[in-house]
Amino acid sequence: MHFTVEAQKIVADHLLPGNIAIDATAGNGHDTVFLANTVGPHGKVHAIDIQGQAIERLQQTLSQLDLLERVEVYAADHALIEQVVAPKLSSFVDCAMFNLGYLPHSDKSITTHRASTLRAVEGAYRLLKPGGMMTVLAYVGHPGGRDEAEGVSAWLESHADDLRVDRIQDESNPQSPILWVINKNP
């Protein structure tokens, strides 16, 4: 199973043209482009990444695909999601996507971490409208990845009364990524 594709399929069933979405870990921009195409010309995507290299690639890709007008790009730590994105919002967010870990084909020592990810997930949750969806894809096979995933799992458990959570993982593979599909109660 390709977990990124699975996350996008699930989000595609929820997100509508004209909606507002967040790509909290923009990276190479695959989720950002998917979200921008899904929300259409009347929607908006807010894409965040801490790495300048990722931001440059993302802006080039968005320009080539004529999607720049649909996307606000922020060079910032995803832990600051609420402070960075909230001032630009006219309403709550319909969907947020997280693809944790490191930027493919780059410095693998630069990764998301438990503390910043938990701040980011909490911030995105507060920006999410009732009935909104969030996906979090965690990779446990890199240093710090399992700790980060355990932190996300604990955060979800602590908010169990406010959320409906589906967990997707290849249980036969202990190194399998974990995809959480989170729906905020209406």
Mark where each language-model region is:
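Conserved SAM-binding motif I beta-strand of class I
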Residues: 44-49
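Class I S-adenosyl-L-methionine
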Residues: 142-186
